[in-house]
């Protein structure tokens, strides 16, 4: 067979600087004119690199010529840069086998799902200490409730340590009220659900009815225009899934003005599907703007309630309109735009009860990703020769970028990074760069400086997403076992890219009077590009920092387990990765505390809260979990050291143990203050506005209380002690704990033994503790937390007992609802 001729890679003549900012290059050597004018270092791709690639291709023969584009050398790795890992001496490379499906499974009542590797529940199950604490609190709550239901009085009415119900009573009551109020909700949009469609016989009567409902909810024209402007200025810049000019044009043909200065919706049969698409988009846009407006602290509570009710009605109407369009049977770009905004509205809803990302939320996001691929959005639009209209090409491009930005913002840090999507993203980036080099039309569409900057923001975030996806994909694989140094190298690459393209220094700099770098969207909306850029810098940094924290944390736990039997080989790894995770936590916590305290000197506007705050609520839970993980180790280590000190005969040994106990006491106080500081900040800024924060803030105030009274260890051991001592835990409670947390109550002695054994934390030693204390003392966040906090966090809860809390919760026939919240089936419990 004749050898197949392999096409040689084309040498890119554009210099790297001009290519980066997407400007025309005159290709002069050794330095182009633009780089000379701006005193930039001008560099071109080397032919030697390309010739090496050609040689490799030639040697591969027939099979190589049939590889997909994304299997060739990635566009982001052509620079030839080599990253120094900077690992301490003694840290060894190792093959990692981290994940166990058992630790990601969740079974609560009638719900079963496999969580993502870095999701909150998976991380809790991955750590034996947090897992034991969560299972103990959950089990004791079920026991108390079971005893109450059976009329069994509390064994100890004067408990020295309060249970969690005293703290979370109000949150549970509000959750019960919420479950009653929203008992019937619209189903998640998906392949298997459709209430009605345009093909039904009663469509001619159904549509006017829906239109009348929309008109009834909409306000006067001037108020609607204010809400649209609010959406354009505060929401659209971060979710630019549509062309505002086209949307406004569609509105002019849809809306008529009646005599009462209100909008009247046209009911002409002509282009009815297009009108329903526009109407569904209008309803969800207005719902999001209303939700944004109700976060204004200066609004009267009655106005907030009306805005919330109107937003909920508009959201439900949008859902009905999307069902009418039958969006999964008749997919197109316009309905996909509506679906994206509907999803964002549900995700950002301050009244959502989710404390962490729910499986429903993530499953819906994957529906959207799959639908985008059904539409063929994963391929650069220029690859389709049948698309001639530049508006269609632009729309398809922004929709692909849109769904990927949602994955980046919402699910990437959870460990949702499939290789298939990463490959599509990278191939898309390669094709797009080739397109802009060959196309003059793209340059015309982004000729202004502001447009260039906006494009840089979007594409830099996309490139960072590609890099992080590869990193997360390597870390979460259950089939391939990566090498530690390979992971560390990818982390370094990701950190460097984030620091270069999203520097946090710009959001801490004082604002100076200068003309806004404006870009016009639609007829009359002007956006400040620098303002958008600074908000994106913050959002990108907290996502990237969360990814790094999750990876370092899990690697630390992995080597902690290894050190139980092989401490000589892996202790250096454990110390290095624990310190890396601790520093990553301090950095992320510092960013979030600075945001909550408005420390960015006006660089991030208060009106951005609707975009940012929901993500902050979720990330705070992750940070508090990390603090719990560290506090549990400090506390158990302290107990172990006290036992060693009391049993030591040698004076020198006693002095060593005493010194370590003192260090642990200081560290416990530091982390306690950091947790309490973030809890207080969240209480002040988020708790009243966000239902999720309303539930999580008091729960972690309870953890602060346990630290203050020295009860963290005893509460963690409590459930397991109760099983071991009297064995009176009801079988249904034991089963519930086993299914939700994967801990078999029959092994309660073994579970507790692992917690209290000095061998479990033998490498969590003084060397590491001193390094952690140094990190705390050099952290501005830690210093600020120590200054801000007092010891009075839990005083308001001291005057209510567990039994009184249950009495208050279960009055007014709340029994069924409360049991539902615990995730259990009422039929398995005794009746009152």
UniProtKB/Swiss-Prot annotation:
Residues 15-42 bind DNA. InterPro entries: OAF3, Zn2-C6_fun-type_DNA-bd_sf, Zn2Cys6_DnaBD. Keywords: DNA-binding, Metal-binding, Nucleus, Transcription, Transcription regulation, Zinc. One of its GO terms (cellular component) is nucleus. The keyword Transcription regulation applies. It holds the Pfam family Zn_clus. CDD domains: fungal_TF_MHR, GAL4. It is found in: Nucleus. It comes from the Eukaryota. GO terms for molecular function: DNA-binding transcription factor activity, RNA polymerase II-specific; sequence-specific DNA binding; zinc ion binding. Its main location: nucleus. Zinc cluster transcription factor involved in resistance to cycloheximide. This is Regulator of drug sensitivity 1. It comes from Saccharomyces cerevisiae (strain ATCC 204508 / S288c) (Baker's yeast).
